[in-house]
From Swiss-Prot:
Belongs to the peptidase M24 family. SPT16 subfamily. It holds the Pfam family Rttp106-like_middle. Component of the FACT complex, a stable heterodimer of SPT16 and SSRP. Residues 316-336, 768-789 form a coiled coil. This is FACT complex subunit SPT16. Residues 467-524, 942-1056 are annotated as: Disordered. SUPFAM superfamilies: Creatinase/aminopeptidase. The gene is SPT16. GO terms for molecular function: nucleosome binding. Residues 943-995 have a biased composition (Acidic residues). It comes from Oryza sativa subsp. japonica (Rice). Keywords: Chromosome, Coiled coil, DNA damage, DNA repair, DNA replication, Nucleus, Transcription, Transcription regulation. Gene3D superfamilies: 2.30.29.150, Creatinase/methionine aminopeptidase superfamily, Creatinase/prolidase N-terminal domain, FACT complex subunit Spt16p/Cdc68p, Pleckstrin-homology domain (PH domain)/Phosphotyrosine-binding domain (PTB). Residues 477-504, 996-1016 have a biased composition (Basic and acidic residues).
Length: 1056
């Protein structure tokens, strides 16, 4: 017996094996019912069915006799003859197998009413006499002298036992009929347990392709190594046989290969199922193609997938691959219950005829076959001649290819190429190997060969691979010129696409104006006391503060009049000689930033200010302080309540069971930090079933982050920074303590801040200094490794099928592409990632999603300037333009290269633009924007005459010396600012309302700046100089020179 292919069984008696009696009974009944129902058309009107399984073999092969053994008994029974009759089932086998089969007698009788008859063959016995007994039993039960016995005609007898059996049948009076089609139909419909095995096999196959084959090819190509196809085959086979290598938790003893993995490149391609890998080196030069096909088995059930990888593909190759991919998808879509199998191939043909009819002659003659216990279930061939009906529960290997295609480049190894795609699919439609993408952007390894300066269609690559090529990949002497030419051509194509995309989006949204800010929320009605009786009795007519009811009691005309503390705008006290004056200001309708929604009677007369004089300075000071404290507490509470009210309800965190410990990262800090007094504590970050939980030793310090709320996840190890961090940018705000945020960060300081008490400088060769530096390096490496292990485990968790739609994976910022700039108020080192532009060290954090960017405008670009600015315009025109100022000019070329490789359209201008009126004009009149050429008004490369004309054009698009007419002073002040933001509103808010809490340095500086502006004074700050600039044609400011651009062209794009 063997439970894995045709291998020999392990040592020991039959007790080492057990047969699942439930499966045996159920499947035996299915077999007999099918035989009875389709005896005339599929089983050859047979009276008996004889199955002879050959001896074990070292070759990898698929036999229907072996498949029947596994399907019915759970194991393969080599050198065993089984004869099924309506009332009896005869087994001719060895004693060990007979002992195991004997346990099935009752189950067989209960299931189909058949008795199991055992014929035990001795070790040196030929078995001929036992065979005669079986033949006589067949003739006796059929009541005919020439009964019809079904057998598998294509399986030639092997070994002495099967040869003797074949001779016995041919020499007897029985008639033989081929029943191959019967077994093909029987095995086609998979039950639940079979489907589970196929799914596990498919998951292993796709995991090997995604987590082993692709990274392996990436590394080979990136390092330009010489590796043979056969060595890749051997390494991939080992990865399949050891599932833990690809992070798949399947038992290795249940796993096997369907066939040796196939790697093909260099112009030699064979798309037949029996293809093999040769000993040639993997060829990955320009315009080359690599085909990889792998298949894994689990519990003897097969799966298969094939992918084609394109290396610096030509437009013709890209078109052929896209056509094949569409045809493959059409074939998958046609796998519906009730359709004929020929319709699957026809669906693929229809796509080819529509998109590229010239490729029809290169299309493979079949779209695949059924798959299961056999790698190719021939009766389920998806070719144009098979009219069998597709049924639910069938599993197919949908394999489609284009062979012998002619390439544009006529080198020996690229003049001819082939393309192949294959996936394992369950009916109704479920692509079991879809986790490994076949999209062009994920299989194209593209770098521009600089020998050519002709227009080349841009190969869309994954953002993760969208990096500038290294000089090692540029083989032309005039590389800089051709590089700039290619970039200009690509940008022109992007401009066309961007204008079309913007026109479609504006047409769909329609015109409209406004700043996109919704109406302010109305807070609850402020009530201090529900009725007069609740007002506390006062013995003295003095100002009192009722902390419990949040009220201020004021003596007015001999009565204590209560005011809710929220109605108090500010309170001040002033002492003059022995008299102390208390002035209380109230919020009234019509005042800036007053909450009118709380003032029900808008037509009534309101108290705006009240003054009291007192000769008790101590009491006056105490009352003022109590009012300020209470007002601050209430304001903070209401603000937090209002913020919480706007939060999106999150799902509940499902904690990991006790059996499976959650992945933990200990002793980490969180930003933003929890509020409250007391010493700040580190906490533990845990990964659970559907989210993260961060908690400290304090019960009230806990944060849950759901995986579904994570928009971007970043891991930034400490290199030149002092911290190693994990950063989560969220879809919706959450509360961290009493702070509402979309960015949550967990970090550890890799270096302790210490100071030598002695104050003496130590030598660089001082042993203590060297030892301390080594300790710091070890600590940094250990922390980075702890974070890396946590990230790897979470990435593995996210790769599970239930998180497929979230598309989550930790992204690592590409430091070599970073540049210095000022995104807010201070200079920072800004770093691109595969999907974002981030700055995660300094607060406030910067996270810009690249897919949300409309265009990028590089401003103040010109000769002689030491730095320039970057204006990022988002697809949501109601969102403020993000500015990154003071970027060193030495970073300009690298930034343009990065923008181009990430398919972002950029423009250059010599001046700063005021974007708020520009976007407002676009929103108000999108048709005019489209008619005027879209974003091309930003094109600095236009003719001089056109530039002169644009100076007099609509101010909504071009800068102008003249101030635009505005309807209010507020708009005038807005138009004077280079960067439209909410800071001005915040400044006014600070000016009109006195915050009765300790002010930060930024708030004090803002108040001083406002006072200087009112008095006409000049501010020396760079921000104020920028604010005083005229909206458009402004002089270039000379900010401090930043350090030069540290990055440079990175390595080749990663191969996906």
């Amino acid at each position: 017996m063997a439970d894995n292919g045709n291998a020999k069984p392990g040592g020991g008696g039959s007790g080492a094996y057990t047969i699942n009696l439930d499966n045996f009974s159920k499947r035996l009944k299915v077999f007999y019912d099918h035989w009875k129902e389709h005896n005339s058309d599929l089983w050859g009107s047979s009276n008996a069915i004889a199955i002879a399984t050959p001896p074990p073999s070292e070759d990898l092969r698929y036999l229907k006799s072996s498949a029947l053994d596994v399907w019915l008994l759970g194991y393969e029974f080599p050198e065993t003859i089984i004869v099924f009759m309506h009332k009896q089932i005869h087994f001719l086998c060895s004693q060990k197998k007979a002992n195991l089969i004997g346990t099935l007698k009752k189950a067989a009788n209960d299931a189909v009413g058949a008795d199991i008859v055992l014929h035990v063959k001795a070790k040196n016995d030929s078995g001929v006499g036992l065979m005669e007994d079986i033949v006589r039993a067949v003739c006796a039960q059929s009541k005919s002298d020439d009964p019809i016995v079904g057998h598998i005609a294509k399986e030639a007898p092997e070994g002495k036992l099967l040869e003797a059996w074949a001779d016995k049948l041919s020499s007897s009076s029985v008639q033989l009929t081929d029943i191959t089609n019967g077994f093909s139909e029987l095995f086609a419909m998979k039950d639940t347990s079979e489907i589970t095995c196929v799914k596990k096999a498919s998951y292993l196959t796709s995991s090997v392709m995604k987590n082993f084959v692709v990274p392996k090819l990436e590394k080979v190509i990136d390092e330009e190594r010489k590796v043979t196809h056969s060595s890749l085959m051997d390494e991939t086979e080992k990865a399949i046989l050891d599932p833990l290598k690809v992070k798949v938790k399947l038992k290795a003893e249940n796993v096997d290969i369907c066939y040796p993995p196939v790697f093909q490149s260099g112009g030699k391609f064979d798309l037949k199922p029996g293809a093999s890998s040769n000993d040639d080196y993997l060829y990955y030069d320009s315009a080359s193609v690599i085909i990889c096909a792998i298949g894994a088995r689990y519990g003897n059930y097969c799966s298969n997938m094939a992918r084609t990888f394109l290396i610096d593909a030509t437009p013709t190759q890209i078109k052929a691959y896209e056509t094949l991919m569409k045809a493959h998808e059409a074939a998958l879509e046609a796998l519906k219950p009730g359709n004929r199998m020929s319709a699957v191939y026809q669906a693929a043909v229809d796509v080819i005829e529509k998109n590229a009819p010239e490729l029809l002659r290169n299309l493979t003659k079949s779209a695949g076959t059924g798959i299961g216990l056999e790698f190719r279930e021939s009766g389920l061939n998806l070719n144009p001649k098979n009219d069998r009906i597709i049924k639910a529960g069938m599993v197919f290997n949908v394999s489609l290819g284009l062979h012998n295609l002619q390439a544009e480049k006529k080198s020996e190894k690229t003049k001819q190429y082939s393309l192949l795609l294959a996936d394992t699919c369950l009916v109704p439609l479920e692509n079991l190997t879809a986790s490994c993408s076949k999209l062009v952007k994920d299989v194209a390894y593209s770098f521009n060969d600089e020998d050519e300066v002709l227009p080349v269609k841009k190969v869309e690559v994954n953002a993760k691979e969208a990096l500038p090529p290294t000089k090692a990949t540029l083989r032309s002497d005039n590389q800089e010129m051709s590089k700039e030419e290619l970039r200009r051509q690509h940008q022109a194509e992007l401009a066309r696409q961007k204008n079309e995309e913007t026109a479609r989006r504006l047409a769909g949204v329609g015109s409209g104006s406004g700043d996109g800010r919704g109406p302010s929320r109305s807070s609850n009605e402020l009530v201090a006391y529900k009725n007069v009786n609740d007002v506390p009795y006062a013995r003295e007519l003095v100002i009192q503060v009722d902390q419990k009811n949040e009220a201020v009691l004021l003596p007015i005309y001999g009565s204590m009049v209560p005011f809710h503390v929220s109605t108090v705008k500010s309170v001040t006290s002033h002492q003059d000689n022995r008299t102390c004056t208390i002035r209380i200001f109230f919020n009234v309708p019509g005042m800036p930033f007053s909450n009118d929604s709380n003032l029900k009677s808008q037509g009534a007369i309101y108290l705006k200010e009240i003054t009291f004089r007192s000769k008790d300075p101590r009491h006056s000071s105490e009352v003022v302080q109590q009012i300020k404290t209470l007002r601050r507490q209430v304001a903070s509470r209401e603000s937090e309540r209002a913020e919480r009210a706007t939060l999106v309800t999150q799902e509940k965190l499902q904690l990991t069971s006790n059996r499976n410990k959650p992945v933990r990262l200990s002793d980490v800090w969180i930003r933003p930090a929890f509020g409250g007094r007391g010493r700040k504590l580190t906490g533990t970050l845990e990964s659970h079933v559907n989210g993260f939980r961060y908690s400290t030793s304090r019960a009230d310090e806990r944060v849950d982050i759901m995986y579904g709320n994570v928009k971007h996840a970043f891991f930034q190890p400490a290199e030149k920074e002092m911290i190693t961090l994990l950063h989560f940018h969220l879809h919706n705000h959450i509360m961290v303590g009493n702070k509402k945020t979309k960015d949550v960060q967990f970090y550890v300081e890799v270096m302790d801040v210490v100071q030598t008490l002695g104050g003496n400088r130590r030598s660089a060769l001082d042993p203590d200094e060297i030892e301390e530096e080594q300790r710091e390096r070890d600590r940094k490496n250990r922390i980075n490794m702890d974070f890396q292990n946590f990230v790897n485990k979470v990435n593995d968790h996210w790769s599970q099928p239930q998180f497929k739609g979230l598309d989550l994976e930790f992204d690592v910022p590409l430091r070599e592409l970073g540049f210095h700039g000022v995104p807010y108020k201070a200079s920072a080192f800004i770093i691109p990632t595969s999907t974002c532009l981030v700055e995660l060290i300094e607060t406030p954090f910067l996270v810009v999603t690249l897919s949300e960017i409309e265009i990028v405008n590089l401003e103040r670009v010109g000769f002689g300037t030491k730095n320039f600015d970057m204006a990022i315009v988002f697809k949501d025109f109601k969102k403020d333009v993000l500015r990154i100022d003071s970027i060193p000019s030495t970073s300009l070329d690298a930034i343009k290269e990065w923008l181009d490789t990430t398919d972002l359209k950029y423009y250059e201008s010599r001046l700063n633009l005021n974007w708020r009126p520009i976007l407002k004009t676009i929103i108000d009149d999108p048709q005019k924007f489209i008619d005027d050429g879209g974003w091309e008004f930003l094109n600095m490369e236009a003719s001089d005459s056109e530039t002169e004309e644009t100076e007099e054009s609509d101010q909504g698009y071009e800068p102008s010396d003249a101030e635009p007419e505005s309807e209010s002073e507020d708009e005038d002040s807005d138009s004077e600012s280079l960067v439209e933001s909410d800071e001005d509103d915040e400044d006014d808010s600070e000016e009109d309302s006195e915050e009765e809490k300790g002010k930060t340095w930024e708030e004090l500086e803002r108040e001083a700046s406002n006072a200087d502006r009112e008095n006409g004074a000049e501010s020396d700050s760079e921000e104020e100089r920028r604010r005083r600039k005229v909206k458009t044609f402004s002089k270039s400011r000379p900010p401090p020179e930043r350090s030069s651009f540290k990055g440079g062209p990175s390595k080749k794009p990663k191969f996906r």
